[in-house]
């Protein structure tokens, strides 16, 4: 059971990292504008903070993933990563500052991912 806890923590952290990185990339100046980008980091702007938090979330996610893989089979753990696609999509649609459009086609695709996850991760019925 702890393996699933660690896998879920990894998924939540990596999902949060994706959202923070997206927000940071929208908030920060382009990489080509070196002076403006450096100024954003030196001034500790919200975009720079979001970038650092996102990177740390990735690092902690890797630690959680390590703990998960020590406890559950890769064939069960790896499909759980697809839950991140579902969470990031739903959050991106729901968070107004990301300006992500909703579409029925994308909802269908995310639903297929979620159903596939259930099929892989639910216990097999023994006959």
Curated annotation (Swiss-Prot):
Pathway: Bacterial outer membrane biogenesis; lipopolysaccharide biosynthesis. The chain crosses the membrane at residues 1-21, 49-69, 78-98, 102-122. It is found in: Cell inner membrane. GO terms for cellular component: plasma membrane. The keyword Glycoprotein does not apply. Residues 22-48, 99-101 are periplasmic. GO terms for biological process: lipid A biosynthetic process; lipopolysaccharide biosynthetic process. InterPro entries: Flippase_ArnF, Small_drug/metabolite_transptr. It comes from the Bacteria. It is a multi-pass membrane protein. One of its GO terms (molecular function) is carbohydrate derivative transmembrane transporter activity. Keywords: Cell inner membrane, Cell membrane, Lipid A biosynthesis, Lipid biosynthesis, Lipid metabolism, Lipopolysaccharide biosynthesis, Membrane, Transmembrane, Transmembrane helix, Transport. Residues 70-77, 123-127 are cytoplasmic. Belongs to the ArnF family. Heterodimer of ArnE and ArnF. Translocates 4-amino-4-deoxy-L-arabinose-phosphoundecaprenol (alpha-L-Ara4N-phosphoundecaprenol) from the cytoplasmic to the periplasmic side of the inner membrane. HAMAP family: Flippase_ArnF. This is Probable 4-amino-4-deoxy-L-arabinose-phosphoundecaprenol flippase subunit ArnF. The lineage of its organism: Bacteria, Pseudomonadati, Pseudomonadota, Gammaproteobacteria, Enterobacterales.
